[in-house]
Amino acid sequence: QRQMCIRDRYKGAGQNGNFYPECYIIPLDGKNQTNLQAAADMMEWLTRNDVKVNVTEKEFTYDGVAYPAGTMIVPMYQAKRSVANGALYDGTLINGWTILYSEGITSFNETRGFDMVTVAEPAAYKSISAVCGDAMDHDDALAYTKALTSYFTGDKNKDVILSNASEDSTAAVNELLKAGKTVGMVTSG
């Protein structure tokens, strides 16, 4: 017996029982997103490949987490859902070939380092889609991501921890060093 690719369906309580989830949530805010740059890059990549993405116009809650207006939603109710799902789902187990020329790349959120949530419950998707704006094309996404900015939370004139989560965070450290500021590294705790 030879197994080629194993991909479970979403069979949990309230889930759709399908190969595809209902949508993916990709936060575009600092509270819910570790790497805003990579999330914005993903929005650009998806729309460049004709995947439709939406941005929420109001806050919503999923699985106990509040997401603000401006959160990216990638619905699976579209012609390019296989493109989106191929890039975003959590991977395929291929165990039928002993040698592969190359591994397939999936789980872009893991390889590129951005936070993402999979939604497989139709009832949850119904409430999420109700707060979404119109689908964005690539030009819309470029304009939207260009307007995204970093932000600071915390006490001014105190020590700040910058997570090494993106090219932008590295660039920020380099700018601090060029300006003669003291920069240290947390090695434990």
In which residue ranges do the predicted regions lie?
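Intrinsic-disorder/low-complexity accessory segments
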Residues: 1-3, 7-189
